[in-house]
Amino acid sequence: MESNKMVVGVLLIAAFALPALALFERDVITHETIEAVLKKSTPNSNTMLQEDAINALTGKTLISQTILEETLLKNGVVGGSIPCGESCVYIPCISSLLGCSCKSKVCYKNSLALPTLEKDVITPEALEAVLKSNGGAIVNTKTIISNAIFEETLLNNANHVLGGIPCAESCVYIPCLTSAIGCSCKSKVCYRNSLALN
């Protein structure tokens, strides 16, 4: 009886440790992600798939959300704002239906938008303010992203220097469009009063 308990204990440890160690050698997906994709693709259905069906349909190994999150922390993987509960080592993100995309072998929501300090972006609100200030005559060559993503980007860029009130626009290559409403460029971000706070 004791040997049975020991075998069960070893199997439990292996079940939790092995997926974490092998996460970036194969593709995995969580139950929560499968549920979200199913709800998005068939909103009126209460379909739940068994583990073997998920593996067969997706080509990905089922893993718990806890193990995935622990593995991401241990491997120092960061990308977008929200991990989508799926890796993309060999197989593209199934959660792309939910707005997720692949970065550093992990599917993230907003992973393309988050490194915004590498390209020029502006929020709809900032663009609208600029348009109102100059009578609607402007050519926008910046990528439009949500205010929430822009704010999260400021937090995720640890090397970023704050100075003034962010005007919801970056100025990596293109000057601040929001200069029309009193903003200026500092550390790749347009700020109101950025010169006064230097």
From Swiss-Prot:
Pfam family, one: Cyclotide
Superkingdom of this protein's organism: Eukaryota
The entry's keywords: Disulfide bond, Knottin, Plant defense, Signal
InterPro entries, per database record: Cyclotide (IPR005535), Cyclotide_bracelet_CS (IPR012323), Cyclotide_sf (IPR036146)
S-S bonds: C84-C100, C88-C102, C93-C107, C167-C183, C171-C185, C176-C190
Signal peptide: 1-22
Propeptide residue intervals: 23-79, 111-163, 194-198
Post-translational modification, as annotated: These are cyclic peptides. The mature peptides contain 3 disulfide bonds each.
GO biological process: defense response
Protein family membership: Belongs to the cyclotide family. Bracelet subfamily.
Free-text comment about domains: The presence of a 'disulfide through disulfide knot' structurally defines this protein as a knottin.
General function of this protein: Probably participates in a plant defense mechanism.
Name this protein carries in UniProt: Cyclotides mra4/mra5
